[in-house]
């Protein structure tokens, strides 16, 4: 679980304090006035400026303002939109809400396995960063490849020139290690004495000699980058490091010369760079800050959409609670796609086990488990821990590699050789010091080396650790520490054990725990395919809100939404209905539900149409445009199932070319003197029991572009044909409604919806731990012979005919979302599922007895081996 708002608040503070900057919404006005939400939505995007003490704009309209952060509170007046829609953690571009997922990639900070035609498969590789060029701000890298079988080290630098590995390489390695440019506070670990400097090649061989006992697809070999970390890298590499150099130079110069050189007030210092940052944010390509390979791939394969595609996720309101900040997206390319779908065993308890996102990108999107977190990088904290160990003599300096005894361990930091060693007997104290206070530091151990790792993109899980069987501390463990048998905590000599107290919740994300709060038992009692149906429909579910008589229409989300009575509201996606398992005249065949004639549910449809046009004017001509919307008596029902809405009249002294297909809109044109008059009509569909709640039209003119925004809000209480899904993953559509008040409980509660008995049995559902009452048909509970039937208070979701819906290939036109779709599909998969599944067991009996012999025939053995996917148990 990561908190995006907290991460960004810390980032804003860090930048402000380090570079002495002040944030303002617009450097041109520099006013402190707070804006309304609608004003931000009308602007291009929600990005702000950062001014220095001379009031020059350092970062010009390129700092993203994340909703819910302190910057957002500084610039915007809070309103009801926040509370109802969970928008915290999202950002806004072009009036759309977006979130950025955590990005998972292979870990190239530590020693790792790799595939390269030049080297054998068993070789291991490490990149040493260092040899920093302050002038050009380049952090060069050298690639070390180690072949364990021949005990040979190969080295090549970024210019692909291979070094011959001789004694001379020691001095090159020292240059890279001593000045990593990545973890400055820890540079004292890499100050070697004269003798040790000559042994660096040997030292690195010892480190790289240990076996990597996890595969390239394991979570132990992954790092996950957070949104805030990538934004910080982008701002720093594009603008802030250049600005820092200017600051350093200014500090060196004399104060008088600075006064003469001072720029004029309100200038923008880095206009081009700021535009580059905005492009990067808009195109969702933050990952290029980390990996140069991706930007190269884009140039080489312009059509390869995978890595160069936009990672921003557009979000429709209201946002699923706890979704933002917990989504993880894998970066894959087409050749890797199939392999990457695998989830290795060490994903368990770190990455949610149930919700694997859409079918189209299966294996690419995940959610973090509730106890998993992505800690921030803090090399200062690690440096303090090493200083503490030195002060208390728990570690000592290495003078000569050959002097290190068998009772000692060399210490490596991020798989780099350091100048420290420790006694094996002190290991548990070192574990206690390093791991306490939930420090995100990974520890590994071999017979010669203690590995201490702390780098960007670590993924950790919160656990309790018992040290020396006496002290319990709360710690953060990495996948390697928690899952692998070679982990330091499964080593009996170290005497550190993990205290376990987990149930099925440890496999779930916070999002799932919130929406399935009182129904967690479903996750270990219901078949997994049904859970996936339930979770996928939760994602596509229509927003649910409490019905209020007054002002129900004002804050509606776009598209369909559901207003329900407060008594049945569960959360912003679910409501409860009393459910009776029964059928009537086969109305529930093929999975429909029979609803009660009067449910406390109202369906709203908020449709926003944007009609665009271009004024035909010369480059410097001005133009008059006026729009009058028709406020009353402005619609008429037509015979063909449509409603015609007269939106209004637009008058202009220039001609307008409208962009429309002539189907949804009708525009009548005429001229009046020098003016062009346009009457705009809009068609929309009639549905049963439709009530027109709001019709509105307004105009925005920007340069020579004209846009009419037309809002149509309708509601209906007729739910026939709408898709519904129960919390158990039983989906269907509403059939014709019936009066269900005859199924009455003693307290006056009656059934509200009927579930198909066949569906209930075949889905292996169970209604354990769900509120139930007993009803009698006719409601006469005094009759002792009257049969009692249970009704269950089950949560339901209504969901849309989404465009990527399975049925789209059969029903080409989904006009209202009320079209019935069950029973339309009869392709190979459906035939196989329904026909073969139900007949297979019968035909097996026939085959088994077909030869009239006591032994099973070969045909029976072959066909019974195909019974993998059916819930069939065979008894001899």
UniProtKB/Swiss-Prot annotation:
EC number(s) per UniProt? 2.7.7.6
Question: InterPro entries given for it?
Answer: DNA-dir_RNAP_su2_hyb_sf (IPR037033), LEF-8 (IPR007025), RNA_pol_bsu_CS (IPR007121)
Gene Ontology cellular component list: DNA-directed RNA polymerase complex
Q: Could you tell me the keywords of this UniProt record? A: DNA-directed RNA polymerase, Nucleotidyltransferase, Transcription, Transcription regulation, Transferase
What PROSITE patterns does the entry give?
RNA_POL_BETA
GO MF annotation list: DNA binding; DNA-directed RNA polymerase activity
Q: Gene3D superfamilies under this entry? A: DNA-directed RNA polymerase, subunit 2, domain 6
Name the catalysed reactions. RNA(n) + a ribonucleoside 5'-triphosphate = RNA(n+1) + diphosphate
Q: Name one GO biological process term.
A: DNA-templated transcription
Subunit architecture: Interacts with LEF-4, LEF-9, and p47.
Record-stated family: Belongs to the RNA polymerase beta chain family.
What this chain does, per the record?
A: Component of the viral DNA-dependent RNA polymerase which is composed of four equimolar subunits of LEF-4, LEF-8, LEF-9, and p47. Plays an essential role in late and very late gene expression.
**Per its record, how is this protein called by name?**
Probable DNA-directed RNA polymerase catalytic subunit
Q: Per the UniProt entry, what species is this protein from, by scientific name? A: Autographa californica nuclear polyhedrosis virus (AcMNPV)
């Amino acid at each position: 679980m990561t908190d995006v708002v907290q991460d960004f608040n810390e980032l804003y503070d860090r930048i402000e304090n380090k570079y002495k900057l002040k944030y303002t919404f617009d450097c041109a006005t520099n006013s402190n006035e707070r804006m309304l939400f609608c004003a931000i939505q009308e602007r291009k995007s929600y990005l702000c400026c950062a001014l220095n003490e001379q009031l020059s704009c350092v970062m010009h309209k390129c700092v993203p303002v994340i909703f819910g952060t302190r910057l957002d509170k500084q610039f915007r007046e809070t309103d009801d939109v926040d509370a109802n829609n969970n928008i915290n953690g999202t950002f806004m571009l072009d009036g759309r809400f977006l979130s950025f997922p955590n990005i998972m990639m292979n870990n190239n900070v530590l020693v790792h396995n790799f595939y390269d035609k030049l080297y054998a498969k068993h070789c291991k590789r490490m990149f040493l960063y260092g040899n920093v060029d302050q002038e050009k701000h380049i952090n060069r890298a050298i690639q070390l490849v180690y072949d364990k079988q021949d005990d040979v080290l190969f080295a090549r630098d970024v210019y692909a020139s291979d070094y011959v590995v001789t004694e001379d390489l020691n001095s090159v390695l020292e240059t890279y290690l001593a000045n990593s440019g990545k973890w400055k506070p820890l540079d004292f670990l890499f100050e070697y004495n004269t003798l040790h400097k000559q042994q660096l090649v040997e030292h690195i061989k010892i480190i790289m000699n240990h076996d990597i006992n996890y595969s390239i697809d394991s979570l132990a070999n992954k790092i996950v980058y957070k949104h805030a970390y990538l934004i910080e890298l982008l701002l720093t590499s594009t603008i802030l490091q250049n600005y820092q150099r200017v600051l350093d130079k200014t500090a060196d110069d004399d104060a008088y010369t600075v006064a003469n050189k001072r720029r004029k007030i309100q200038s923008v210092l880095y206009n081009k760079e700021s535009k580059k940052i905005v492009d990067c944010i808009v195109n969702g390509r933050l990952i290029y800050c980390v990996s140069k390979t991706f930007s190269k791939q884009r140039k080489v394969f312009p059509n390869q959409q995978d890595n160069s595609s936009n990672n921003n996720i557009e979000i429709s309101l209201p946002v699923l609670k706890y979704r933002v900040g917990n989504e993880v997206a894998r970066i894959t390319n087409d050749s890797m796609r199939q392999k990457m779908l695998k989830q290795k065993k060490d994903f368990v308890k770190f990455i949610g086990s149930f919700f694997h996102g859409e079918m189209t990108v299966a294996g690419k999107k995940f959610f973090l488990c509730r106890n998993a977190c992505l800690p921030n990088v803090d090399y200062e904290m690690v440096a303090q821990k090493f200083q503490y160990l030195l002060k208390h003599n728990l570690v000592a300096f290495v003078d000569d590699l050959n002097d290190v005894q068998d009772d000692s361990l060399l210490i490596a930091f991020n798989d780099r050789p350091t100048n420290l060693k420790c006694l094996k007997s002190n290991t548990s104290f070192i574990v206690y010091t390093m791991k306490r206070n939930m420090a995100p530091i990974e520890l590994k151990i071999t017979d010669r080396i203690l590995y201490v790792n702390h780098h960007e993109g670590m993924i950790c899980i919160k656990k309790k650790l018992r040290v020396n069987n006496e002290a319990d501390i709360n710690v953060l463990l990495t996948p390697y520490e928690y899952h692998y048998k070679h982990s330091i905590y499964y080593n009996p000599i170290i005497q550190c054990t993990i205290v376990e107290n987990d149930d099925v919740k440890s496999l779930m994300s916070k999002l799932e725990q919130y929406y399935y709060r009182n129904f967690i038992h479903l996750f270990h009692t219901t078949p997994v395919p049904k859970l996936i149906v339930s979770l996928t429909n939760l994602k596509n579910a229509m927003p649910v809100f409490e019905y209020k008589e007054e002002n129900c229409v004002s804050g509606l989300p776009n598209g369909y939404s559901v207003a329900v009575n407060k008594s049945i509201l569960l959360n912003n996606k679910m409501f409860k209905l009393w459910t009776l398992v029964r059928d009537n005249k086969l109305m529930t065949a093929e999975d429909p539900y029979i609803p009660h004639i009067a449910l406390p549910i109202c369906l709203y449809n908020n449709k926003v149409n944007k009609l665009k046009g271009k004024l035909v004017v010369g480059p410097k001509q001005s133009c008059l445009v006026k729009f009058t919307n028709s406020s009353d008596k402005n619609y008429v029902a037509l015979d063909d199932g449509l409603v015609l809405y007269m939106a209004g009249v637009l008058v202009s002294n220039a001609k307008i070319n409208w962009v429309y297909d002539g189907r949804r809109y009708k525009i009548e044109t005429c001229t009046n003197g020098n003016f062009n008059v346009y009457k705009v009509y809009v068609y929309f569909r009639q549905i049963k029991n439709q009530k027109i709640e709001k019709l509105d039209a307004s105009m925005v003119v920007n340069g020579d572009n004209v846009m009419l925004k037309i809002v149509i809000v309708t509601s209906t209480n007729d739910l026939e044909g709408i898709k519904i899904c129960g919390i158990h993953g039983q989906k269907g559509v509403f059939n014709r409604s019936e009066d269900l008040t005859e199924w009455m409980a003693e307290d006056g509660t009656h059934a509200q919806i009927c579930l198909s008995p066949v569906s209930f049995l075949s889905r292996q559902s169970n209604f354990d731990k769900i509120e139930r009452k007993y009803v009698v048909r006719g409601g006469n509970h005094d009759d002792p012979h009257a049969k009692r039937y249970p009704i269950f208070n089950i949560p339901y979701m209504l969901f849309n005919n989404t465009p990527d819906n399975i049925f789209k290939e059969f029903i080409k036109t989904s006009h209202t979302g009320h079209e019935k779709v069950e029973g339309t599909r009869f392709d190979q998969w459906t035939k196989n599922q329904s026909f073969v599944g139900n007949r297979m067991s019968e035909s097996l009996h026939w085959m088994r007895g077909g030869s009239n012999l006591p032994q099973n025939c070969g045909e029976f053995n072959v066909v019974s081996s195909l019974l993998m996917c059916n819930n069939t148990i065979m008894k001899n």
